[in-house]
C-alpha cells in the first residue's frame, strides 16, 4: 500500500522514497506487512525452502469491472471515497462529506493517485508471471502501482458528476486525522520491469463505478 510512504517530502514517490512514520493505524499495519515479507525472504535465503516476494504498493484503487457485474461492495459505512460518491448519487446516503478544503493544494482538497481496479488486477498478473517465470532480479522486489497522475478529491467529485450526468449533494467537512495532503506514484519501475502500465482513465473508471452501483440497485 502507498500508505507506507507516510507524508512524503518529495513527489511523486519512487520505490526508493524513504518510508516515513505512518499517519494512521492502517498505514502502520501496511509497513509491518512489508517488514514481515522482507524479513521472511531474508531469513530463508540460504535454505532449501527459500521464499521470494513482491510487494505491490497500491495507490487508490477505484472503479468496477466494465461488465458492471463485479465491483466494490462495502459492508456498512464505506472506507473509500468512490463508494461514498456512488451511494450518495443513488440515494443510499443523503450527503457526501469532503474532508478538508484548506490543504495546500490548488483547490484545497487532498491529492491522490486513483487507479482503476482492472489495471490493478493486471499488475498482479504481471507480478505473479515475473515470479513464476523466474524473471525477478532480486529475491524481494517492490513496485508502485498507480497512474502517476494526481487528482484532487474535488476534481474526482466533479468528474463523476460530469461523466455520469449526476448532481451530487456534498459538503466540506473538517480534515480527517491521518489523511496525508498529497501522494502519487512514479510508476516507471513497474512500467519497465513488469511491462505494465495503467490504461484506463479516471473518467472511464468513474463510469464503471456508477454502472456497478446502478446494477446493485437493479437499475
Regions found by a protein language model. Name each.
Residues 81-219:
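C-terminal substrate-binding subdomain of Rossmann-fold SDR/epimerase-dehydratase oxidoreductases
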